[in-house]
Amino acid sequence: MLHHVAAVVRSSRTALVIADMPFLSYVDVGAAATNASAFLRDAGAGAVKMEGGAEMAPIVRALIESGVPVIGHIGFTPQSALQLDRTRAQGKEPATAGQLLADALALQAAGVAAIVIELVPTELAALITQRLTIPTIGIGAGAACSGQVQVLPDLLGILSGPSPRHAGE
């Protein structure tokens, strides 16, 4: 993974390259610090992105306090989806919607620079965006987020199964 991030960094003159921390690479503060610092030091990334909510806040805070810029990721979390049985949109039920809002607030309090919100109902993504003071980046979460991302394999339809609805036709 470091090799791929380094290649992107070498090919970019001005973009902020954010390394997506692999699943299980940040299970505790020690592992997170070792792996995140490698992305920054060895690959040249400008920040790391980590999936998870309030349960990740202590690890996120420790990284940020050590100088590692972190982007959060809540809602559908693709790296852990199969392992954690979260293969669908998140936040449709009141309890999970409330938890996602709490997750976003906890990550903001921990110091993340922005939060990716993926496959969350439009109204919930709008509420989260309104409640935060940091940018939100939506993936299939409606137009109310601060910015949007489209995933190239989704747009091209090159994965098995149907393309996500938010990818368009």
What is each model feature region?
Residues M1-A167:
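Alpha/beta enzyme core
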